[in-house]
Amino acid sequence: MSKGCQTQGPLSELEKAIDVIIDVFHQYSRREGDKDTLTRKELKLLIEKQLANYLKHVKNQVSIDQIFKDLDNNKDQQLSFGEVMLLIIRVTVATHEHLHFCEDHQQQHQHQHQHQHNH
């Protein structure tokens, strides 16, 4: 960030997370072609290196191609920050739902154990 663009106070947790998302996008967007968009190759690398745990099923080029096609709203064969954010949003929502599912399943499991032990 340039001096004129710095924030006034310390960043909140959410603001830090936003900065990390922007920084990670730029780590990959600056590798080839336009410095502020992702090519198919840059998207593949970003998914492999930064979303490996959350997108375990995305292993092959066909999956990458489909994700790229789904995100490339203006069909210009590159992904803007806004287009990549659609992927981040989808992964975040899916992760949130998965965590709740795991939490609910764990509580049900514990609840069943309590009933079994109280007999």
UniProtKB/Swiss-Prot annotation:
GO terms for molecular function: calcium ion binding; calcium-dependent protein binding. Residues 23-58, 59-94 form the EF-hand domain. One of its GO terms (cellular component) is cytoplasm. Expressed in v-myb-transformed myelomonocytic cells. SUPFAM superfamilies: EF-hand (SSF47473). It holds the Pfam family S_100. Keywords: Calcium, Metal-binding, Repeat. Ca(2+) 2 binds at D72, N74, D76, Q78, E83. Ca(2+) 1 binds at T37, E42. GO terms for biological process: endothelial cell migration. SMART domains: S_100. This is Protein MRP-126. It comes from Gallus gallus.
